[in-house]
Amino acid sequence: MRSVTPLIDSVADLWDSHAAPPADDLLAQLLYASHLLGANRAVANFGGGNTSAKGTALDHTGRAVPVMWVKGSGSDLATMGAEHFTGLRLDEVLPLVGREAMSDGEMVAYLARCQLDPAMPRCSIETLLHAFVPAPHVHHTHPDGINVLAGTADGERLVRECFGDSAAWIPYIRPGFTLSVQVGDAFDQGRDASLVEISCRDSRSAATRCA
């Protein structure tokens, strides 16, 4: 039988529980995961992708409040430091789920007012995608394997064949408020929170994995 050489190498799980920061250090764990993802350019191209984690942190008054740490604009997963994440007060962000529409400018301005510290990096237009997904950890990347699969003419059928009902297919829509709502809705429709979400972007696609 003729052997077949895969066009895309499989992606190894590099998480090392001994090397990873303790679970109670949420930001350090997020940075560790981000570096692992960014180290493989077949998973996250330079400057592409973003990661987030939800938990609690102290605000400027010293109160513990629900927050989401998310990669800020202009940083790279492989080389970023903890200072490149932005902390957002979730109790101020989540009410946006009820809005019907929001421009990019309105969204960026609103999120700036939700930051724990105004000196933190500016949020990307994909920040609400992370906030609206009901999972504590969200890793959003552009892996080569998903690009090849979802970017074909028959991409939707192939994605469903590979991932079954655990995958949500969202036809191309420009990143921003509407896409964030659609992704959040896809996760709310009875799917397991560890699913892979596929978003087709013409010749580009994105995979969002949650846990």
For every predicted segment, state its role.
Residues 1-211:
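Glycine-rich flexible loops
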